[in-house]
Amino acid sequence: MVMEIVKPNTCIRGCCTSESIPLHLPSSSFTLLSPIAKGSESVVYEAILDGRRVAAKKPILSTSDDLDKFHRNLQLSCNLNHPGVAKLLAAHAKPPNYMFFFDFYESGTLAEKLHVEEWSPSIDQVLLITLHLAKALQYLHNNGIVHRDVKPANVLLDEKFFPYLADFGLAEYKKNLREVNLQNWRSSGKPTGGFHKKNMVGTLIYMAPEILRKDMYTEKADIYSFGILINELLTGVVPYTDRRAEAQAHTVLEMNYTEQQLTVAIVSSGLRPALAEIGLHLPKSLLSLIQNCWESDPSKRPSSDNVVLELESIWEQVRGKQQGHLLEKTSNSQSDTDGADIIKNSGDYRDTVNWFSQGECLSKKSSVSTVFDVKLWSSSTDEPSRYVPVISCGSFATCGRRESMEDTHFIIPHMCNEESIHLFAIFDGHRGAAAAEFSAQVLPGLVQSLCSTSAGEALSQAFVRTDLAFRQELDSHRQSKRVSQKDWHPGCTAIASLLVENKLFVANVGDSRAILCRAGHPFALSKAHLATCIDERNRVIGEGGRIEWLVDTWRVAPAGLQVTRSIGDDDLKPAVTAEPEISETILSADDEFLVMASDGLWDVMNDEEVIGIIRDTVKEPSMCSKRLATEAAARGSGDNITVIVVFLRPVSTAERIY
């Protein structure tokens, strides 16, 4: 693809330029299609650029620092030219749509290959992939660049499964890192916390001990991360966990260590991921290389030049010198074909299950027979004097410090066109987002279909039926091999509030919670279902489940879940039940607002603080929800955060405090 370059080929600031990469594109030259991946800093789309299928990375530019980072990233990316580095095809470096355009890599990321498809590469495949990546790192380091986020999620695979090092959002020139050292930062009069925030970057489980100690980043930190990556490629295990599935990573990781505990163990105790076991075809020299790469002392780690030499030597030992031509990848050589055959023998499988769509289909089926001309849960008596709240509602959700979002939620005011019936719910996924995504689509239709029962019973049955439907759907996909992880058992906590005239019904399984502000004070509408609760512990044991003290608290074994009720988690049924606890509350004029939130909020904020923050915020429910979530993130919440705020009486958005 040859694209026309319009002169002057610079960014809006004039600081970025290229002779071969277009830096500003007419809007007619590209089309964004569906999102491929979403993160806290960018969204990646499948796109069409000048008639070619590409990947478009659209950064989230909320501050001037974000914009500065975009230009630094563009300057660096324009200077990269190596067969093992993801190629920048074009960029749009002018407002309002700042974007990067890259080749589209058919097989996704190495992380997906290992932990979604559960690929088990041969030693030949491991060596080819690691050697190509080592040469990409060698190229960067020899050009004075430190990547700072080497991990399988940042390795892309083409249709032949050759690897390409990608995502240079954190990459920096070594000279720039040396210029911004701690002493210079202090002399500028700036708080040292800002220095550490700018320099302690990357992904925790791949970060070198010196970075966790908040020392300066060097190329030796990339080597440490590369050693972790090689071991992960050999074992198929997410670092510091005992399971293959990426979806289970944060659950298992948290079961053993908090972030602080893991940091201390890596830095002070020399903790490392479980080393691959020596097998018949696994040379000891490769394991020695891994251990050398993750040495605590950076000076004892090999350079990228030495890593390449060692991997070439190991390859010759394994494959023989007569096949040494496979080591160099050129676009049209026979060695490419042979190498591709070696790497690709596992097939091109991608998990295609869309759990939102699966839930939506089932929801439509469940609601077909619902009679909507009958008033839902209508009152048995006509009392004109009965208090009926006037609602306004809003929500906010953020992935917080997580790399992915596993919460979902919905807000349905005036359900089925009933003026006084409203439904709200939050689903907090664990071991993946599948259960949460499915449940958010299914539950409303099931609640509507159960309108012939009482409102409380409708909620209860809807939870149980949603759980059953999800587990059946998951099993069906397992049987049809559309879900490749046989040991994948996703689940979610759930909390739903059904407001019928002046009655508020709350159903809950898990550790999300809901409170009312009643006459200025918090009024609990639910309680958390945790293994630390003696009643819940006894119930689980009575149902045949196991509760064990694991690291720091009671948990449901063997999965290590803290919650004792959930939707999904089919490996823990029936002990981890989906039957919710139901509360019924009669509302009055004393009730000011309802707050529902996932545990990412409640982990760092108590009921009184939540009430106080809303009282001190403009009375717009979405704004209140956002303020609570951002405050929780600022306080160090390590989880996804979802908040729903429902005002129960008329309020003015100009009113800041009561």
Curated annotation (Swiss-Prot):
GO biological process: L-ascorbic acid metabolic process; regulation of intracellular signal transduction
The reaction(s) this protein catalyses: L-seryl-[protein] + ATP = O-phospho-L-seryl-[protein] + ADP + H(+); L-threonyl-[protein] + ATP = O-phospho-L-threonyl-[protein] + ADP + H(+); O-phospho-L-seryl-[protein] + H2O = L-seryl-[protein] + phosphate; O-phospho-L-threonyl-[protein] + H2O = L-threonyl-[protein] + phosphate
Active-site residue numbers: 149
Record-listed ATP binding positions: 36-44, 57
Gene3D superfamilies in the record: PPM-type phosphatase domain, Transferase(Phosphotransferase) domain 1
Keywords: ATP-binding, Hydrolase, Kinase, Magnesium, Manganese, Metal-binding, Multifunctional enzyme, Nucleotide-binding, Protein phosphatase, Serine/threonine-protein kinase, Transferase
Pfam families: Pkinase, PP2C
Residue span(s) of domain PPM-type phosphatase: 392-648
GO MF annotation terms: ATP binding; metal ion binding; protein serine kinase activity; protein serine/threonine kinase activity; protein serine/threonine phosphatase activity
Top-rank lineage group of the source organism: Eukaryota
Binding site for Mn(2+) 2: 428, 599, 639
Note on how the cofactor is bound: Binds 2 magnesium or manganese ions per subunit.
Family: In the N-terminal section; belongs to the protein kinase superfamily. Ser/Thr protein kinase family.
Protein name, entry field: Protein kinase and PP2C-like domain-containing protein
Organism lineage: Eukaryota, Viridiplantae, Streptophyta, Embryophyta, Tracheophyta
